[in-house]
Design a protein with these regions (language model features):
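Soluble extramembrane regions of membrane proteins in the secretory/endomembrane system
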Residues: 1-167
């Protein structure tokens, strides 16, 4: 229907509630025989970390996926520790959810902690797949127009869906 669209390079992103739509789009896309979405950037929201039974899961499959998680986000990035104590957004990288995401949906227990701003790669279905979490030191509403967040958007999509002529 749109011959100018490269169907092998479709990326989706959204800030806050827009990322809920992104996660919903991925779930719907997973029902397609041939998924259309190649790259996902979740912006100030949470990825889908577990299935309905609470087991870690990789709903993103062989897509490149990143998260922009503002350090001082007032709404997202919270979790609980192994004792059930609430962890707020500044401690997101210490959470099992963040670590599971960077370990491609597997249980991170007993594994070395992974860091923000690092692309992690794994072979999934014969494809080299990336995961990254960006942690700009800002609050939730600042993130959608922050130069730090927008730099992350450009970096992520240039890595996931490289332009034929790199963006300068």
């Amino acid at each position: 229907r749109m011959p100018f669209v490269d169907k092998g390079k479709i990326g989706v992103t959204g800030h806050s509630m827009g990322s809920w739509s992104v996660n919903a789009a991925v779930k719907q896309d997973n029902l397609n025989e041939t998924p259309l979405i190649s790259a996902v950037l979740i912006h100030c929201n949470d990825a889908v970390y577990t299935d309905d039974d609470g087991n870690y899961v990789n709903i993103y499959g062989s897509r490149d996926v990143g998260i922009i998680s503002a350090v001082y986000d007032e709404f997202f990035g919270g979790s609980v520790d192994e004792n059930g104590n609430a962890l707020q957004s500044p401690y997101y990288m210490e959470s099992a959810n963040a670590q599971s995401f960077l370990y491609f949906g597997t249980d991170p227990s007993g594994k070395e902690a992974r860091e923000a701003y690092t692309f992690y790669t794994e072979n999934i279905d014969g494809k080299e797949v990336n995961r990254i979490i960006y942690r700009p030191g800002i609050i939730h509403p600042w993130s959608h127009f922050s130069a730090r967040s927008e730099k992350a958007v450009c970096e992520f999509f240039e890595k996931a869906l490289p332009a034929p002529n790199p963006i300068a």
